[in-house]
Amino acid sequence: MATIKDVARLAGVSTTTVSHVINKTRFVAEATQEKVNKAVDELNYAPSAVARSLKCNTTRTIGMLVTQSTNLFFSEVIDGVESYCYRQGYTLILCNTGGIYEKQRDYIRMLAEKRVDGILVMCSDLTEELREMLDRHADIPKVIMDWGPESSQADKIIDNSEEGGYLATKYLIERGHSKIACLSGHLDKAACVERISGYKRALNEAKITADENMIIEGNFECDTAVIAADQIIEMEERPTAVFCFNDTMALGLMSRLQEKGIRIPEDISVIGYDNIELAEYFSPPLTTVHQPKRRVGKNAFEILLERIKDKDHEKRVFEMHPEIVERSTVKTLN
């Protein structure tokens, strides 16, 4: 592997000159630049990121902890983060924890050892232990996204899940629905608690009694949506509408209901949550609650860059507000 000394020898200049040409830290005559660049190309020389990080006290690297990168919502946020990292000359290290404590612990340790400039956290399974681990590395700038916990050591972006649950349920009520089921994720997750709170607030405003039997626990994946669809089919009094806590479950639910001869939205209306790309192209196209996923990714990265530049800045909370995207899966009854 070629070294900076090899480049300097081939170009007939000093190693200092080579460094200035590569890093653009001082004026170097054009003819000399051409010699150095030609030598770099001939030797296929790659500057040492380790050496540069020691000199500049930055690795131009960001770590990102996620629960599951294959989740369609997470993957679209990650895509936004990666895109903005690349544009700003940063490398993204993606750590897929699967919600496993040991992996979370080991990845945080690894990111600290690699001297990342900052960490983005987007995990649905965040425990007090994980928060303490993050707080232990107070010297590393952090931004917590989506379902993460409050931390004295990190900026936070919140998605206003309660507001989203309220908007989705109110949308159905305004179209004449009063028997509204909801298919949640795990009921102990903060986002689910908040969306159920919003669901109940909308029902209460409309003087509709919330029926706990209409709250079906899922896991944000298609398999539980299929089980939920079968439960709904067996109900003596079926709901006229179902509010699903993410689009993945909504699409799974619709697929199963249609397979059993139940038409969407003629027989049962469905509204989702997240507005993933696939939602628009399903049949029928899914009405859903929009979350600006790529903007969340962009904002998170920009906030983290600010924190990297000014570690002593007061910790902040940034709010994102959901909105309804109207398509073809909700029938108006009144």
Swiss-Prot record:
Coiled coil: none annotated. Pathway: Purine metabolism; purine nucleotide biosynthesis [regulation]. The keyword Metal-binding does not apply. Residues 4-23, 48-56 bind DNA. Residues 2-56 form the HTH lacI-type domain. Is the main repressor of the genes involved in the de novo synthesis of purine nucleotides, regulating purB, purC, purEK, purF, purHD, purL, purMN and guaBA expression. PurR is allosterically activated to bind its cognate DNA by binding the purine corepressors, hypoxanthine or guanine, thereby effecting transcription repression. This is HTH-type transcriptional repressor PurR. It comes from Vibrio atlanticus (strain LGP32) (Vibrio splendidus (strain Mel32)). The gene is purR.
